[in-house]
């Protein structure tokens, strides 16, 4: 399955929530005046009753789109989350949050996860001093992520840092924006992760 490259607000409207696919800190209903309508020519208003399966599928699609992960990748993350000790849903979110592109975004070096992914693929990011270009690398506690010297003057990185200052940096990450460098202190606890995600619906979907 190819990665979606169409209008970002369309995906957020489909899921009925801000997937944080666009830069900026404006509320979802300000970013798009059609927030309460599904995409499509006739954009039906939300509120109709959905089946249990539909709710589970929508939650999976929502999370997959938030993190920019393809279907097969997401399925593999779920299998890994189910294999290790602990709550499967929480494990899944930890795996997604520990992706290098997500950590780059959380540190404020990219204004969106897509932009952070591009920085990684263009080798503008270093991991423990080495340039890398694989966005899905699992970052571990103590790993140091930094913007490569040759990319430090990029305007988009400076803009992203300004947005991050408004958005806030998670407690499980330590960042020095003056050096464009940060440390992944530990995998986040569930309380540190987005409350609007209902991972239990995803577990129910894959458990069928």
UniProtKB/Swiss-Prot annotation:
Q: Which GO terms describe its cellular component?
A: small ribosomal subunit
Q: Which GO terms describe its biological process?
A: ribosomal small subunit biogenesis; translation
Q: Which PROSITE patterns match?
A: RIBOSOMAL_S4, S4
Which of UniProt's keywords are assigned here? Ribonucleoprotein, Ribosomal protein, RNA-binding, rRNA-binding
InterPro entries from the UniProt entry: Ribosomal_uS4, Ribosomal_uS4_bac-type, Ribosomal_uS4_CS, Ribosomal_uS4_N, S4_RNA-bd, S4_RNA-bd_sf
Region described as Disordered: 24-52
Q: Domain named S4 RNA-binding: which ranges?
A: 98-160
GO terms assigned for molecular function: rRNA binding; structural constituent of ribosome
What's the family?
A: Belongs to the universal ribosomal protein uS4 family.
Role summary: One of the primary rRNA binding proteins, it binds directly to 16S rRNA where it nucleates assembly of the body of the 30S subunit.
Self-association state and partner proteins as the record states: Part of the 30S ribosomal subunit. Contacts protein S5. The interaction surface between S4 and S5 is involved in control of translational fidelity.
What is this protein identified as?
Small ribosomal subunit protein uS4
């Amino acid at each position: 399955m190819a990665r979606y490259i169409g209008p970002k607000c369309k995906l957020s409207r489909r899921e009925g929530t801000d997937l944080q696919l666009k830069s900026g800190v404006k509320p979802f209903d300000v970013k798009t005046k059609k927030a309460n309508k599904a995409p499509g020519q006739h954009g039906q208003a939300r509120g109709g009753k959905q089946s249990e399966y539909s709710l589970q599928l929508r939650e999976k699609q929502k999370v997959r789109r938030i993190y920019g992960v393809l279907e097969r990748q997401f399925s593999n993350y779920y299998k890994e989350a189910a294999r290790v000790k602990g709550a499967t849903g929480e494990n899944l979110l930890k795996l997604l949050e520990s992706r290098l592109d997500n950590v780059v975004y959380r540190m404020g070096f990219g204004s969106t996860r897509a932009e952070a992914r591009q920085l990684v693929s263009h080798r503008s990011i270093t991991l423990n001093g080495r340039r890398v270009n694989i966005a899905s690398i699992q970052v571990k506690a103590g790993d140091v992520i930094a913007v490569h010297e040759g990319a430090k003057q990029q305007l988009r990185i400076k803009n992203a840092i300004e947005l991050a200052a408004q958005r806030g940096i998670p407690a499980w990450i330590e960042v020095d924006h003056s050096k464009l460098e940060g440390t992944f202190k530990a995998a986040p606890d569930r309380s540190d992760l987005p409350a609007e995600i209902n991972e239990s619906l995803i577990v129910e979907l894959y458990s069928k």
